[in-house]
C-alpha cells in the first residue's frame, strides 16, 4: 500500500523545485536521500523533509510491513504551482514593476517495488 506526503505553500518557485524533484523520481528511498544530501540546491532540504514524512506515513499505514529505505521507491513526485504573492517595486518616472513571489505544493508518493530503469 502506498503512502503520500504533501508539503504546501513552500516559498520556492515551482521551476526550481521541479529540478530537484526530477533528480529522485523513480529511485529507491535510500538512493534519493543520498542524492538530496549531496545536492547544493536549497529546495533539496524541503524535498528530503517531505520524503522522510512519506516514509513515516508508509510505516504508520503498514505496521506489519517492516520495509526499509532500500525496499521503498519514490513512485511519483510532482510539483504544483501555489499561490503567487504580488509586490510592487518602485521604478523610474513614477512607474512600478511587479514582483511575483511564487510558491509551490510538493507531493511525494512512496511504495514498495522496483526502481524505474532509464
From Swiss-Prot:
Domain of life: Bacteria
GO molecular function: rRNA binding; structural constituent of ribosome
Keywords linked to the UniProt accession: Ribonucleoprotein, Ribosomal protein, RNA-binding, rRNA-binding
Biological process, per Gene Ontology: translation
An annotated GO cellular component: cytosolic large ribosomal subunit
CDD domains hit by this protein: Ribosomal_L22 (cd00336)
The family this protein is said to belong to: Belongs to the universal ribosomal protein uL22 family.
Descriptive protein name: Large ribosomal subunit protein uL22
Native species: Prosthecochloris aestuarii (strain DSM 271 / SK 413)
